[in-house]
């Protein structure tokens, strides 16, 4: 029987299909192996990332405060160069930089705005609302000047801080190294978000007057911009450009007012963390056999931290004073205004959110600031755990220093931020509120602004 070959074209197509399916079957095994390798590589990369996260943070103050300083420079505060560096020796200040020019121009605008506010209060309208606006812009002008002055000293302060940190017992656990940075980041995010919400609600409440009694009925944007800076435009002819400039100044001033508290809180948390680092180290060794050299080294570290706290306080005491005096004034003013009827729901929401946020911010600021003093006194508790046979003259000297020193931030030496300051602030608020209520006249719903 003769062998038939069939159609050569069909035969070639059939053979190509057979080869294709054979290759695909082999390829499926290869693909499956590649998929397993890919999954294993993902797991390996994830594990490596975990190990890298452990060493991502060094635990230094410069590393923790870096995001705060970057945000500050966006809003024309703290014009220090290379704040994104993890090393304090990289920080520099120079007058001839974009940051410094930006900060100086902003300070100039704050000063001009304050001057117009003074003129408005003295010659046009002297009442509680106008004085409150004047106090706000004057305090912002002083705050911006204080931060510019601090920026000139900051590189030296950061280097001193880094030297003190280098001599402290090392932070061994990754959780300990990232704790300070995460704490300061949380403070910054929460406070900045609340400030943003407060400002948005302020603009929404201002929209009530834009709709009810606009400056120009057919130009709502211009009416809004005019209303944002109406005290200045009483003396200066309004233009769209000046309206935008006025709104920018208003936003920058609002952030500067809130950043004042954020910065003092961040510095307080960092100083308290360094004292806590030393205290935890002594607590671990307190019940164990210790030597004179051990307590001598601990006392030197404690003394270095006290000197660092004093150096920082000398640099930021003006900012601290402005911070607490501002909060005290505006809390009294807002509590007094709480008895006024509100013209719209947005006014009511904005007012109560602003009051609660201000009260909470002041309370948290007081507690964070007082934690420095609390941690500086904590060694007295640790010393009681030391066995009698290991008690020595060096430890006695250390105990006397801790007992005699009063380590805390101050408001230009007028007051010290200890835990008792919370009660003092509350008592002062109640006292001033009672005085203000005696002079409080009949309250009415604020009407449209007069030309």
UniProtKB/Swiss-Prot annotation:
Q: Does the keyword Transmembrane apply?
A: yes
- Source organism per entry reads Drosophila melanogaster (Fruit fly)
Give me the Extracellular side stretches, as residue ranges.
122-130, 205-223, 272-344, 442-446
Tissue-by-tissue expression: Expressed in Gr5a-expressing sugar-sensing cells.
Q: Show the InterPro entries listed in the entry.
A: Gustatory_rcpt
Task: State the similarity comment.
Answer: Belongs to the insect chemoreceptor superfamily. Gustatory receptor (GR) family. Gr5a subfamily.
Q: Which residues cross the membrane?
A: 101-121, 131-151, 184-204, 224-244, 251-271, 345-365, 421-441
GO CC field: plasma membrane
From the UniProt record, which GO molecular function terms apply?
A: ionotropic sweet taste receptor activity; ligand-gated monoatomic ion channel activity; sweet taste receptor activity
Q: May I ask which residue range the UniProt record assigns to the signal sequence?
A: none
This one is known as Gustatory receptor for sugar taste 64e
User: Any idea where this protein resides?
Assistant: Cell membrane
Keywords attached to this entry: Cell membrane, Membrane, Receptor, Transducer, Transmembrane, Transmembrane helix
Q: Which GO terms describe its biological process?
A: monoatomic ion transmembrane transport; sensory perception of sweet taste; signal transduction
Keyword Cell membrane attributed: yes
| Ranges per topology, Cytoplasmic | 1-100, 152-183, 245-250, 366-420
